Design a protein with these regions (language model features):
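Secretory targeting signals
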Residues: 30, 34, 48-74, 104-181, ...
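Hydrophobic alpha-helical transmembrane segments of multi-pass membrane transport/permease proteins
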Residues: 17-42, 60-73, 193-206
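Helix-loop-helix units of permease transmembrane domains in multi-pass membrane transporters
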Residues: 79-109
Length: 291
């Protein structure tokens, strides 16, 4: 366990962008809250006031999550390749650390540690934003931003998304690690060209698109399985702001669908595929180290 923790710390030492990028985003959003324009005079109807808190907090959270998704994917694509590129793999191989532990530490960093860092950064910056906006707008916005139940739901949503996306997108994660362990150069080309070639070959020789359909299902199938849809009107709240109709969940508890997600065969089929690719990355790392 101590070795694994040390490996995680090593990833943070060598990849300072893990914490620098979310810190920069947090500072930028805090500055925007401090100096941005707030309309103190417009009278907002009660139904729209109920929308302000969830909409603002979700927008802040989505900003961090979008950047986190891009950076985490980039990290997983580069982590094993970079060790070989700068030949630091030879140094780490000289230590009593297994290749399995090294790959799993990088997997943990990309799937769990980085999302948690962004979660903490989003939490702190959102608290600062709410405090600044409340002070600037006095009681006008304070009552809609400082709701303990809303903050609890935001935290639960973040942790739920971290856990479920880590499971659902494990095939993509495994592919990123596999390519990172295999490619000697042009990692992005190795990442993209084999799936495209397989898709084209299936279309050419068999006239089918099963592979492409499975990729699309994996890329787009997360939300329908992890969350309930809008079939239950009582679970959603809508309000018209200007010419736009904004709809948000009346409560996070109404839209989370952990039972449906965990009982889906597609979820666990993806886990098996992802685990196989991660195992392949470990074997490639071992062979690379031996050669």
């Amino acid at each position: 366990m101590n070795t694994f923790i040390w490996l995680i710390r090593r990833e943070f030492w060598e990849n300072r962008a893990i914490w620098i990028v979310p810190a920069v985003i947090g500072v930028a959003l805090t500055v925007a809250a401090l100096f941005g324009r707030i309309d103190f005079h417009t009278v907002v109807p009660a139904d729209q006031q109920r929308m302000i808190g969830p909409t603002v907090l979700l927008a802040y959270g989505f900003t961090f999550f979008a950047v986190m998704s891009i950076y985490s994917s980039w990290y997983l694509m580069e982590c094993l390749y970079a060790d070989r590129k700068d030949r630091s793999v030879l140094f780490w191989k000289s230590l009593p650390i297994s290749d399995t532990a090294t790959v799993l530490a990088k997997l943990f960093t990309g799937v769990i540690a980085i999302p948690l860092v962004y979660f903490i950064a989003a939490d702190v910056s959102t608290l600062l934003m709410a405090f600044i906006v409340s002070m600037r707008a006095h009681a006008y916005l304070g009552s809609v931003l400082w709701q303990p139940g809303l903050w609890l739901q935001l935290h639960v949503l973040w942790l739920y998304v971290i856990a479920t996306t880590g499971i659902w997108f494990l095939p993509f994660t495994g592919w990123l690690l596999l390519v990172s362990a295999w490619a000697k150069r042009a990692v992005i080309l190795w990442l993209v060209l084999p799936p495209l070639a397989l898709y084209a070959a299936e279309q050419w020789f068999f006239g089918s698109h099963i592979f492409g359909s499975q990729l699309a299902e994996r890329a787009l199938g997360y939300l329908p399985r992890a969350f309930h849809d809008q079939s239950n009107p009582s679970a959603w709240t809508s309000a018209t702001i200007g010419t736009d109709v904004i709809t948000v969940p009346s409560s996070v508890w109404h839209v989370l669908n952990p039972i449906g997600f965990l009982s889906s065969a597609a979820t666990w089929a993806g886990v098996l595929v992802g685990a196989a690719m991660i195992y392949g990355a470990i074997q490639l790392r071992l062979r690379c180290s031996e050669s």
